Amino acid sequence: MGNKRPKWRMPLSCVMIALLLLAPGCWSAREIEDLGIAVGTAVDIGEKTELQRSLEEEGGNYSKKNVLTMTYQVVEPGGTAGAGKGQPGSQKKYRNISVTGDSLYELTREISLSRARPIFGQHHKVIVISDKLARTYSLRQLLDFFMREQEFRPSCRLFISKGEARKTLELKDTTEFPAMRLTGISDNQYRNSRLLPPMPLTKALHEINASSSFLLQNLITAEGEVKLAGAAVIYGKTGKLIGFLDEEELEAVNWVTGDIKGGVVKSRHERTGDVVVYEITSVKSEIRSRIENGRIAFDIRIESEGRLGEQWSSENDNFESRNLQQVEADAAKQVEARIAKMLHKVQKEYRADVLLLGDYVRIHYPRMWTKWKKDWDDIFADAEIRCYLTLKVKEFGTTSIKTK
């Protein structure tokens, strides 16, 4: 028998070719030059810019209240044009556009009346809210637009700024995007224990919906530079900012929760007073809840290993057992003092469970949690919290090795 091809092959091939010819491809695609790519947003208390005042005088106005000012950081496609080889661009890579009104959605669309490239949020990285605005309105109100608008990524990071939020999106350096810089700095947890784990929009919304108190990384600015310094305390019942933790208090929170990937603890030599630095290589935190006489209590056991990162003492016995034990004890004393200070602040001053210890009660004592959850922050404020800390020096850098 000869090899006969099935009769259905030829018609099928014709159909497939016809479908390929009719395929529209990326019918909804838009050229990148036609997009106003927003990489960051800052939201402040409403204050009209000089440009807006001038436009309104010419009749460019509509019905609104000046409740908030929204600033978008938009990529400028020609921002580096005209630069020589190895030289930075003659223009900034970005442009900050500010508009004032009472609806974030309306303000976003308002920009399309003055720019050929409307706002496009698929590459959005950060949202920064000023402390004044966060004290006035709840985060649920301020973030509602970003969660509903499909163009904005739920993974974009949320920050609070002490002072004007728009200033965090400005830099002296014209070769860098300020919004990108904020995400880069917030990724430096492996180098510094005074940073919070990044807070994406979706996680913040989860805490807000659960009426949980939580922390947001705080930003400060000066002379065209920005620094991540401490944390903003968001109160669960209201969703508003009620205060701040300083850098060392934030570090203490990370010790308790175990959210430390790296960092240092500086102490002083017992006899000489010289600087000794313990570099953190690992931290483990175990939190256990218990109920005694109808009251909740927590036992927190923290273990850390590290290396001797720096020592200024001229003594020759730095690696003897008794001196290593002293280094460990001095470093532990510093951490314990910071934890005690932080606990007093969050329990007695703010009465806000930013440590999220309520999760342990919910898991291990579900019946009690049902009873307590509405007033949990107040119950947390009166809870007994015991911390047990152990630090061990395991490495000594390249200057010496431990002798057995």
Locate predicted features:
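Membrane-proximal alpha-helical signals and transmembrane carboxylates
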Residues: 2-404
